[in-house]
Amino acid sequence: MAVYFVTGKLGSGKTLVSVGKIQDKIVAGCKIATNLDLRLQNLPQVGRFAKTPRVLRIPDKPSISDLLAIGRGNDSYDENKNGLLVLDECGTWFNTRSWNDKERQPIIDWFLHARKLGWDIIFLVQDLSIVDKQARSALAEHVVYCRRLDRITLPFVGTLYSLITGSKMPLPKLHVGVVKYGDSQLSPTVERWLYTGKNLYNAYDTKQAFSSNYDSGVYSYLTPYLSHGRYFKPLNLGQKMKLTKIYLKKFSRVLCLAIGFASAFTYSYITQPKPEVKKVVSQTYDFDKFTIDSSQRLNLSYRYVFKDSKGKLINSDDLQKQGYSLTYIDLCTVSIKKGNSNEIVKCN
């Protein structure tokens, strides 16, 4: 059983990374209970046609009866199949006053024994220091520190960009949760949770306000298929053409620029003059009257310069271009072959 305290400043992505873990658990077929307002159909890996998610919505500040109502998260002994309980705004529960409150004691006892009921738990708090020390010692198995990378300025490059443009260098909205094993920042890092913001923003209410006067009890979310998927109608041809026109109008400048570049590249490629290939004319030589004028060898490569009866110099490279095959014997002996002809040429 794993218990996580997810901490971070306002807007650092505490809820977002928790919704990301909810999505992972739903995909794995696990049970979910949370006090977050979710939109299951907008989870990218779940979609509007999912029929199997089991997600319970519990009150903003659940009582012991609410926690008992959600039952067991996992009936097997495989902890990988544990359900996930996600609770936001837990700072008011685990401060020193609430921890010693006798009315809250049954809830705290339930959290301490949640492992036996097959639940993993994620508590969201703005800062770990507001949690009672005894609560941290008893429950804070893992602490997750959330950061937003788009709020970080790159050394030197970011400063140079700001001086030139007068604005902060834009970075991708990547939310990172650094998971520590223990309640100290010096504790060892066991993993990192990485989630991009855009694909999860629509999956939960980012402006949800939590209240002690929540008027509903525990209830189950409808599966995305029942709430949205069964009402989905495929687009007809006219609707598809309309969407195509909208997207073409939206990206017309970029599209025209891309077409212009592609056309220019195609035209330059077609009209580019083809290089002339020089044809090497094969000649017939009287190798009986050839002698090796000079030769050299470097590792496995060799080169000869021959002299004919008239004193004309011919190198081995020219002979090979004309289709002659040269076989090295030694620096003063070489075999020249072409077709059925095979001649031995030596030094003078």
From Swiss-Prot:
From its record, what is one biological process in GO terms?
Answer: viral extrusion
Recorded hits in Gene3D superfamilies, A to Z, give: P-loop containing nucleotide triphosphate hydrolases
User: Which positions form S-S bridges?
Assistant: none
Domain of life of the organism encoding this protein: Viruses
Q: Which residues bind ATP?
A: 8-15
Q: What does the UniProt entry say about where the protein is found?
A: Host membrane
Q: Kindly state which keywords UniProt assigns to this record, in alphabetical order.
A: ATP-binding, Formylation, Host membrane, Membrane, Nucleotide-binding, Transmembrane, Transmembrane helix, Viral extrusion, Viral release from host cell
One GO cellular component this record assigns the protein to is: host cell membrane
> Does this entry carry the keyword Transmembrane?
yes
Say if the entry is tagged with keyword Zinc. no
Mind telling me which residue stretches traverse the membrane in this protein?
254-270
Q: One Pfam family this chain carries?
A: Zot
The record describes its membrane topology as: Single-pass membrane protein
Which is one GO molecular function term here? ATP binding
Family classification? Belongs to the inovirus G1P protein family.
Q: What does this protein do?
A: Isoform G1P plays an essential role in phage assembly. It is required to increase the number of adhesion zones between the inner and outer membranes of the host cell. The extrusion of neo-synthesized phages occurs at these adhesion sites. May be involved with G4P in creating zone through which the phage assembled and extruded. Isoform G11P is also involved in phage assembly, probably playing a structural role in the formation of the phage assembly site.
> What's the subunit arrangement here?
Interacts with G4P; this interaction results in a complex that spans the inner an outer host membranes.
- Annotated protein name in UniProt: Gene 1 protein
In its UniProt entry, the species of origin is given as: Enterobacteria phage M13 (Bacteriophage M13)
Instruction: State the encoding gene.
Output: I
